[in-house]
UniProtKB/Swiss-Prot annotation:
UniProt-recorded name of the protein: NAD kinase
Annotated NAD(+) binding sites: 70-71, 139-140, 167, 169, 177, 180-185, 236
Recorded catalytic activity of this chain's protein: NAD(+) + ATP = ADP + NADP(+) + H(+)
SUPFAM superfamilies: NAD kinase/diacylglycerol kinase-like
Cofactor(s) in the UniProt record: a divalent metal cation
Subcellular localization(s) per the UniProt record: Cytoplasm
Source organism per UniProt: Helicobacter pylori (strain HPAG1)
Length: 284
């Protein structure tokens, strides 16, 4: 085994004991740590999204094993993004679009990792800035209303050139990797996960002429709302956006890195997860 492969961080999001997955996760954590040891890996556990607190541990790891669903993987990817570390998901729970393996396939995956028979996927990530506060997004950045009533006006610019005003509940700015998440629920297009582009999808726009827009990732975008709004990152973190305050979004210089099995096929995953070609009554 190469030296750089010897340390794997295990990331588990904190789970309340009343969560139906709590007991399963607790048992899985112990089993995973024992399996890593048996396969010759050093390991450590992180159960916090505070990357600064765990900076030394993060720097030490070759990769991160994310135990849970897509939400767990997204949290880990954001936390480790600035450290340029790859992650791989071991699915526990319902959603597993990003997961590399099920729990019962982890041993084979680790053996393939030791033999360099795993592929590294690099995906576009977003870098956002509000004032002096910067952040990364893996799936999407959403500009949303703070108030339940009324319409939010969002002006959109490419560089300094205005190109649209969205009037509705908000706007999704998604990555190709995130195009099958909130963007898809809002009737945005599916864009191949390895594409270099942004997807702008309006939320319940007041105008019937507004449609989702796909832009090349070479553009720098900025947005401002006519009243106070919320900026939501991957459905997990929020920032306040003051009225007429600019939100700057561009392609992150660092990619999102996911380890996947060599046999993984993007179109097969789409077909299985979205039940393409199946009867509507078929259960997942």
């Amino acid at each position: 085994m190469k030296d750089s492969y010897q340390t794997i961080g295990v990331f588990v999001r904190p789970t309340h004991y009343q969560n139906p997955l709590f007991e399963e996760l607790e048992q899985a954590k112990e089993w995973v740590l024992k399996l890593l040891e048996d396969e010759g890996f050093e390991s450590f556990m992180i159960d916090s999204l505070d990357g600064a607190k765990d900076a030394r541990l993060i720097e030490k790891a070759y990769a991160f094993l994310c135990l849970g669903g897509d939400g767990t993987i997204l949290g880990a990817l954001r936390m480790t993004h600035s450290y340029n570390k790859p992650c791989f998901g071991v699915r526990i729970g319902n959603l597993g679009f990003l997961s590399a393996v099920e729990l019962n396939g982890l041993k084979d995956f680790l053996q393939d990792l030791k033999q360099n028979r795993i592929k590294l996927e690099e995906h576009l990530a977003l870098e956002g800035r509000i004032g002096k506060t910067s952040f990364y997004a893996i799936n999407e950045i959403v500009i949303a209303k703070k108030k339940a009533l009324g319409v939010l006006d969002i002006k959109a610019y490419v560089g300094h050139t205005p190109f649209n005003t969205y009037k509705g509940d908000g706007l999704i700015i998604a990555t190709p990797l995130g195009s099958t998440a909130y963007n898809l629920s809002a009737h945005g297009p599916i864009v191949h996960a390895l594409s270099q582009s942004y997807i702008l999808t309006p939320l319940c726009d007041f105008s019937l002429t507004q449609r989702p827009l796909v832009l090349g990732a070479e553009f720098c975008l900025n947005f401002c709302a006519h009243e106070d709004a919320l900026v939501v990152i991957d459905g997990q973190a929020t920032y306040d956006l003051k009225a007429n305050q600019p939100l700057y979004i561009q392609k992150s210089p660092t990619t999102t890195k996911l380890l996947q099995k060599n046999s993984r096929d993007y179109f097969k995953v789409l077909k299985e997860k979205l039940l393409w070609g199946e009867s509507p009554s078929k259960k997942r």
